[in-house]
C-alpha cells in the first residue's frame, strides 16, 4: 500500500504538464496580486482594458444570463450581440466561467481569469515544445518564454488576445501529432477551437500554419502521401465547419465594416511609409515592450496599438541568434528567417490579416513560439556558440541604446539654438528598459559561466532566473501602464463600477443618455443606453449614418457637443458631466450649456446631471419627407461643426429615391420655404416631433415594442440601426420595415388608438451557421468511426541519421568536419583472433558473483 502511494506521489511530481500549468499559475499570480490588492480585489489597468474589456465582460455576462442574445441596445445605438461580441469574448471558454457568478462579481473575476490564461498558455506552450526537446526541463523553460513573452505582456492591454496565445500551440501540436502518428480528429478539433475563440486571429493562424506545414514538407522534415494529405485537408474543413455557429454570424457582421475593404496596395505594400517602424520592429525583439499608445523608442512610428512585442524574458535574442548561426540545415532556421522577412515587408505582414492596410503585428505570438523553441533547442545543443550569440545581442542592444539615448537634436527657439540629447519621449522609462535588457544578458552570462557544467543545476538555475525576470518586468510594465490613467479610486471604482446605484432618474432605461467628455463606454458600466460607444464591431448602418453628417466613426462613436441635432434625433434625455474634471458642460458657473435645450437637474454618483427639456421619446412620426439625393445636396458638417443634413433629419423623414412614390400618399414633400435650418428651428422641430411620439416604448429580449395613438395613417420612425435580422408587426400583423434617415428603421401604422408595434430580431446567419456545425459534427463522427474500423498503416518513419544515404560533402558541412583526402568513407573493423575450438579452449573463469551464487545454491 505504501509503495503504491509513493509511486502515485512520484508520478504526480514528475508530471511536467501539471508543472507547466502550476508554474504559469504561480508566476502570473505573483505578477497580478499586488495590483489586485491595490484596487480592492479588482485588476484594473489603463486605456482599452478599463473601458472595453471590463464593461464588455459585464454586459455580455448579463445578456447571457438574461437570455438577451439577439440585439444589444446597450452597444452604441444598438448592435447584433453575437456578431459584435464574438470577436471579444463569446468564443472564449474563460468568459463562460463567469456565467455562474452574479453580475457584481464580474469586475473581481478579471484578474483571476488573466492569471488562468497565463497558466494555460504555459501549459499549451509546453504541450507543443516538449515533443522536440531532449529534456522536459528545457521544454518547461520554453513554455515560460512563450507565455511571458513581450507579446503576452504587451497585450494585457487587449485582454481578449490571450485566447489566441493559449490555443495556437494546440493547433501546431495537433498537426505535429497527425504527421507523427496519423491520429485522427485532433486537428479538426484544434481548428474548431482556434476559429471559435477568435476569428480574426484564426486568419493569421491559417497563414502561419500553411507556411509551417509546407516548409517542413519541402525541408523533408515531414513526409505525407496523397491519401493522408487529403484526410488532413478534410479535418481542416470539418474543423472550420464546426465553428460556423459563431463564424457565419460574425462574418456577416464584419463585412458591413468599411475597414475590412481597405486593402494594402502600391508602395505601401512594399515599404513602410514610416521609417521609424523598422527600428520599432527591431527593438521589440531586443527590449521589453513599449506601452500601447505610448511608444518610447520610436515615438513617431505610427504603431501605437500594433502589438509590437516579441522579447523573450532573460534570453532576448541570444538563443535565436545562436540557433541561426549554426551551419546545420534545419527547417526551423528557415521558418524564423521567413517570419522575420514577413515582419519587414508590409504586404507579407498584411497576409496575416486578410491583406488589410492597417498596420498590426498581432501575429507575433506565433513567431515568439518559434523563437522560444529555437532558444531551448540551442540550450540543448553543445555546438551552439553562445559566446558569439551573446556578443551579437549585446552589441545590438548597446548600439540601439546609445543611438536612441544620446542622439543630439538641434532646434531654434526664439532665435536661440538649443540642443537636446536622446530621441525617446520618456528617458526614465527608456533607460529602465535598457537596464532590464542588459541585466538579463548579464544573468545569461553568469548562468553559462558558473552553472553550465552541471546540466540539472543549469536548467534549474535558468528556470529560476527566467521566472524572476518574467515577474519583475511584467510588474514593471503593468505599473507603468497604471500611471497613464487617473487613480482608479478617484472615479472608476466608486462611480463607474458601482453600476449607477445612486442614480435614480425617470425613463433612464427607455431613453438614451449622453456623457460629456467622460470615460469611454461610461453607459455600459451603468447598463443604460447611450449615444457614445468605444466598440470596433457595430452595424454598418451606424457608420453610414455618422459618415453622412461628417462625424468620424472608426472605432468609436464620439459626436462632440457641436452636433446638437443628433441629441434630439437619437432621443437623448439625460446628460452626465464629470464633476471632478476640467471639462465643463456649461462653464464653471454652469450658466452656458454647450448644447441648446438642456437644464441643470442635480448631482449624483460623481456627475452633474442635465435634462433635455426638448427630449423626443423613441418612436415618433413626421409630416414631411425628402429624398436621399436632396439630403445629400445639403451641407454635411464636420467633426466639430454641425451641417444642415443633421438638422433636416428632425424636419423631414429621409427616404431612398426609389421609395419616394410610396411615401407620397402618406407624407408631404418638404416645401422649399421650410428648408431653413438653425438652432431656433431645431428646438421647434423637437417640440413638433415630441407631440407625435409613442406613448410607451420598451426593450425586450427579442427587440423592442412600442404603442402609439395614431390619428391617421402615418410612418413611425425609430432611431434603431437597420439590419437584415429585423422583422416587425403592427397590431399583430407583419409589416415591411423601411430603411430611412440614412440607416435607421420605420414602419407604417394605421389610424387608431393604442396601435401596438413589435420589432423582433433574429441574428442573421445564426441558423445557417448552426446547421453547418451540426452537419460538420455528424461528418466528423462518421469520419472517426470509419477511420477506426479501417486498418491503419504505421506512418513512415525516418531511420537513424547514420543509416541515411546522403552526399559526403553534406555530411562534412553539417558535422563541421573536414577530411584529409576526398573519397568514400571506409569503415575499418578491428580484427580479432580466430575463435579456438571447444577442445582447445580453457574453461571459463568463474566470477565472484557466480561462485557465491553457486555456493548459496549448494547451501539450499
Report each predicted region and the residues it spans:
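Membrane-interface helix-loop-helix junctions at transmembrane boundaries of multi-pass membrane enzymes
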Residues: 222-230, 319-343
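Periplasmic/ER-lumenal interhelical loops and adjacent helix-loop junctions
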Residues: 51, 55-62, 93, 228-232, ...
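Contiguous transmembrane helix-bundle modules in multi-pass membrane proteins
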Residues: 182, 201, 331-497, 751-809
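Soluble catalytic regions of membrane-associated enzymes that act on cell-envelope
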Residues: 100, 426, 432, 458-714, ...
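Start-transfer (signal-anchor) and selected internal transmembrane alpha helices
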Residues: 1-36, 231, 457-465, 778-843, ...
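Active-site-proximal, structured, solvent-exposed surfaces of multi-pass membrane proteins
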Residues: 6-10, 53-56, 660, 665-807, ...
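Membrane-embedded helix bundles of polyisoprenyl
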Residues: 24-28, 118-131, 137-218, 231-251, ...
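Active-site lumenal/periplasmic loops and adjacent helix-entry segments of GT-C-fold
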Residues: 34-132, 137-169, 193, 197, ...
